[in-house]
Amino acid sequence: MAAARPVLARALLQQCLFARLQVKPPEHGAEAEWEEIQRGLVIYICFFKGADEDLVPKIVNVLLNVKLSEDENGEYVSVLDLPGNVLIIPQATLGGKLKGRKMQYHTNIEKEKGMELYSQFVSLCEKELAANPKCMEAGVLVKHGTYGNRQVLKLDTNGPYTHLVEF
């Protein structure tokens, strides 16, 4: 029996009607900063040790083209065909493994490399939506969180449509 190939990235996909992510907390009298989207897809992403730049296009292709959303006819379509907005959230906790009663994150990628891959992932998602005629016409957007920061999320979802995808 062949050895299982290691997981290099994990993404959690969640449909939304509205999502709002705090990317900067309030400080020194300044208001908090938020990113928000209307109907679309929230993508939580985590990279593991061994992940590299070659993996990013595959992840983007799969996640933006998977048919998870219902259109007005009840047909399942991708976020590109909907067309819908995308909110990307870096989520290192997706790399956790339960050991006893604690979570461990030994397989997560190093912070600097993870930040680099996350930036490439966001950029490629932006390019894919910008190159899609339906998305361009509808004016849909890619918004994203800040890598390495704690962030507050408010989410309105249209069902328990949460999917875990490993690469």
Swiss-Prot record:
Subcellular location: Cytoplasm
One Pfam family here: Tyr_Deacylase
Transmembrane segments: none
InterPro entries, alphabetized: Daa-tRNA_deacyls_DTD, DTD-like_sf
Domain of life per record: Eukaryota
Keyword list, A-Z: Cytoplasm, Hydrolase, RNA-binding, tRNA-binding
One Gene Ontology term of the molecular function aspect: tRNA binding
Motif Gly-transPro motif, allows the protein to recognize chirality of D-amino acids positions after renumbering to this chain: 159-160
Main localization of the protein described in the UniProt heading: cytoplasm
GO CC annotations on file: cytoplasm
Catalytic activity: a D-aminoacyl-tRNA + H2O = a tRNA + a D-alpha-amino acid + H(+); glycyl-tRNA(Ala) + H2O = tRNA(Ala) + glycine + H(+); D-tyrosyl-tRNA(Tyr) + H2O = D-tyrosine + tRNA(Tyr); L-alanyl-tRNA(Thr) + H2O = tRNA(Thr) + L-alanine + H(+)
Keyword Cytoplasm found: yes
UniProt enzyme class: hydrolase
Assigned EC number: 3.1.1.96
Biological process per Gene Ontology, one example term: tRNA metabolic process
Function as written in the Swiss-Prot or TrEMBL entry: Deacylates mischarged D-aminoacyl-tRNAs. Also deacylates mischarged glycyl-tRNA(Ala), protecting cells against glycine mischarging by AlaRS. Probably acts by rejecting L-amino acids from its binding site rather than specific recognition of D-amino acids. Catalyzes the hydrolysis of D-tyrosyl-tRNA(Tyr), has no activity on correctly charged L-tyrosyl-tRNA(Tyr). By recycling D-aminoacyl-tRNA to D-amino acids and free tRNA molecules, this enzyme counteracts the toxicity associated with the formation of D-aminoacyl-tRNA entities in vivo and helps enforce protein L-homochirality.
Subunit structure: Homodimer.
Family, similarity comment: Belongs to the DTD family.
Domain comment as written in the entry: A Gly-transPro motif from one monomer fits into the active site of the other monomer to allow specific chiral rejection of most L-amino acids except L-Ala. The trans conformation of the motif is maintained by Arg-150.
Protein name (Swiss-Prot/TrEMBL): D-aminoacyl-tRNA deacylase 2
Organism of this sequence: Gallus gallus
